[in-house]
């Protein structure tokens, strides 16, 4: 499961969800329903798209970060016009992710 936080106008959420699910699932070779796009409410009137994509390794960021940002931006700005699109990343190692109290990564979780 990949989580993507969207900060931006409510009216853009359907388009953002569609593009982000399509592009992230293609890049990560997973099903689109494995990409959760969550809108976070902000107190900002700008018509911009801000996305925070959670990845599990620095390698994903290195290999996919720029290309994924370009594909998402192109999908949300097909003619090169439209809102500014910010794509940023957080790396959350699987050893620090828990589902129903069980570690999602390989090996034992540590907090070092």
Regions found by a protein language model. Give the residues of each.
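Interaction-mediating elements
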Residues: 1-112
